[in-house]
């Protein structure tokens, strides 16, 4: 039999009061004595619940503007006291056992995220008594239940009803794990905030730290275990951030298909992040984290058809992302034409899901619509360390472009240049993208020399019978030599968009002028390693 402990006395002190009234009512109805503090106590009293203020319970007043409320032996002795071992000392000092602690902490993250938050505001939102009670109760989980998540309230009441007012050791242990995770995340936020105020170390430089803390503490929640990692001999799991603010693969709901693999998730992320770059109906097909076909059109059906034409061979077994709802006609076109691992879209119609259901192995994800891109951090693990940088949300507007060639681009060339520049951002370096009339016609990815990426893009276009003449070419970084321009000219490219910045820019521009190519500088690089 599970080691059960009855809940006879509970201390409730929460900043997030969602569901606390109903939970307290349920506890009280089951004969549980309620202790509480400050605003929580007032709220429960207003609802007619029999609640004892902690200051009345301890005989010691709340003081220092609420800084000292629960830091008292009668509270922590009641929480930490070991049943059957500390009973005599507890009785000697008139300490009653507290069987449940319900606490969530001051909203530090929300406070420091507010514009204009001062250090003083941040300091006053560092909870002291709350984490102390949480850790005390979690340490003594053998006898005490610690509740830090409102999502657990209903399950706790159901278990108490099933066990004559008691909770099992398994439940208390699980709640203790959540509690330690909660306090660890809380302390990490505080450490990161204060650590970002410490001057950075840039070799011998004494420049300001920016927003990167001295010690980086990360907290991610396990969403699922994977069958294996990138390869079958590697174990893996998928962890996500808490309260993700942007539609993503982490927030997506799987509505059908086999369990997602490690590679599925990585490739789906690449496809979804690329398709977010476009306002018009768009389709992105990804294979091994590289786009192999991208197009925009008036409908996602036509966008898919055009994206597929870029490289049908690579599209086999790929990931397909849309920035509009998946409809039945598009779903039918995909299922009839190709084998696909994952389809992700903001939503899907019932008719579309009926069609994809015919292929049960196809994974269909809906992620919700995104209103904006949210700044954040990207991480790259190296042996013994972690590289951290801002997400690459950089993009240039038409007004920011610099035409450096003698010939100006036509309106269509400019549209194609901006289109393939958006795609190049998501292709592994060295990246070259050919595009014409809002679709990719050749992609050269991941080559050690830029000229070979340019040649590969031309070869792929020729293999699929796509017309390169009059197309635009995007390069994720500058051309170190003119050879990339010569390769593009040889297949008929008429416009090139690139960051610029090479010591041989003059030679590269001269090559463009020699071939009658319009050349645009963005002054922004998009390396992707």
Curated annotation (Swiss-Prot):
Residues 1-148 form the MGS-like domain. Keywords: Hydrolase, Multifunctional enzyme, Purine biosynthesis, Transferase. It catalyses: (6R)-10-formyltetrahydrofolate + 5-amino-1-(5-phospho-beta-D-ribosyl)imidazole-4-carboxamide = 5-formamido-1-(5-phospho-D-ribosyl)imidazole-4-carboxamide + (6S)-5,6,7,8-tetrahydrofolate; IMP + H2O = 5-formamido-1-(5-phospho-D-ribosyl)imidazole-4-carboxamide. SMART domains: AICARFT_IMPCHas, MGS. The keyword Hydrolase applies. Pathway: Purine metabolism; IMP biosynthesis via de novo pathway; 5-formamido-1-(5-phospho-D-ribosyl)imidazole-4-carboxamide from 5-amino-1-(5-phospho-D-ribosyl)imidazole-4-carboxamide (10-formyl THF route): step 1/1; Purine metabolism; IMP biosynthesis via de novo pathway; IMP from 5-formamido-1-(5-phospho-D-ribosyl)imidazole-4-carboxamide: step 1/1. One of its GO terms (biological process) is 'de novo' IMP biosynthetic process. PANTHER family: BIFUNCTIONAL PURINE BIOSYNTHESIS PROTEIN ATIC, BIFUNCTIONAL PURINE BIOSYNTHESIS PROTEIN PURH. This is Bifunctional purine biosynthesis protein PurH. It comes from Salmonella heidelberg (strain SL476).
């Amino acid at each position: 039999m599970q080691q059960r402990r009855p809940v006879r006395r509970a201390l409730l002190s929460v900043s997030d009061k969602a569901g606390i009234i109903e939970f307290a009512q349920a506890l009280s109805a089951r004969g549980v004595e309620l202790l509480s503090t400050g605003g929580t106590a007032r709220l429960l009293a207003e609802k007619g619940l029999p609640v004892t203020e902690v200051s009345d319970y301890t005989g010691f007043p709340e003081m220092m503007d609420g800084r000292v409320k629960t830091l008292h032996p009668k509270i922590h002795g009641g929480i930490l006291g070991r049943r059957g071992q500390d009973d005599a000392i507890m009785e000697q000092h008139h300490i009653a056992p507290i069987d449940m602690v319900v606490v969530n902490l001051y909203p530090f993250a929300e406070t420091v995220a507010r514009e204009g938050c001062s250090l003083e505001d941040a300091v006053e939102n560092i909870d002291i008594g709350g984490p102390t009670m949480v850790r005390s109760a979690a340490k003594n989980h053998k006898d005490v239940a610690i509740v830090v998540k409102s999502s657990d309230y209903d399950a706790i009441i159901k278990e108490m009803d099933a066990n004559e007012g008691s909770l099992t050791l398994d439940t208390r242990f699980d709640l203790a794990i959540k509690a330690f995770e909660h306090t660890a995340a809380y302390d990490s936020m505080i450490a990161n905030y204060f650590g970002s105020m410490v001057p950075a170390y840039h070799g011998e430089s004494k420049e300001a730290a920016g927003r990167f803390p001295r010690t980086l503490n990360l907290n991610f929640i396990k969403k699922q275990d994977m069958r294996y990692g990138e390869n079958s001999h590697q174990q893996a799991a998928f962890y996500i951030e808490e309260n993700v603010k942007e539609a993503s693969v982490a927030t997506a709901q799987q509505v059908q298909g086999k369990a997602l693999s490690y590679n599925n998730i990585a490739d789906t992320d690449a496809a979804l992040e690329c398709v977010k770059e476009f306002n018009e109906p768009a389709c992105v097909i990804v294979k091994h984290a590289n786009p192999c076909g991208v197009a925009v059109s008036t409908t996602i059906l036509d966008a898919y058809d055009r994206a597929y034409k870029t490289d049908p061979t690579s599209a086999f077994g790929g990931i397909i992302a849309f920035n509009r709802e998946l409809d039945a006609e598009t779903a039918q076109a995909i299922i009839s034409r190709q084998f696909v691992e994952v389809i992700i879209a903001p939503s899907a119609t019932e008719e579309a899901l009926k069609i994809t259901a015919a292929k049960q192995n196809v994974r269909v994800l809906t992620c919700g619509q995104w209103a904006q891109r949210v700044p954040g951090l990207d991480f790259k693990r190296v042996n013994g360390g972690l590289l951290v940088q801002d997400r690459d949300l950089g993009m240039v507007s038409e007004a920011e472009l610099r035409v450096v060639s003698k010939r100006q681009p036509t309106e269509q060339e400019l549209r194609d240049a901006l289109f393939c520049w958006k795609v190049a951002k998501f292709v592994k370096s060295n990246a070259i993208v050919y595009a014409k009339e809002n679709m990719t016609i050749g992609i050269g990815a991941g080559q050690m020399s830029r000229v070979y990426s340019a040649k590969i893009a031309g070869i792929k276009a020729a293999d699929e019978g796509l017309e390169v003449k009059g197309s635009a070419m995007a390069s994720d970084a500058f051309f170190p030599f003119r050879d990339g321009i010569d390769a593009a000219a040889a297949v008929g490219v008429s416009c090139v968009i690139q960051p610029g910045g090479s010591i041989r820019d003059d030679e590269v521009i001269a090559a463009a002028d020699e071939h009658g190519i319009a050349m645009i500088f963005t002054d922004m690089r998009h390396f992707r390693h």
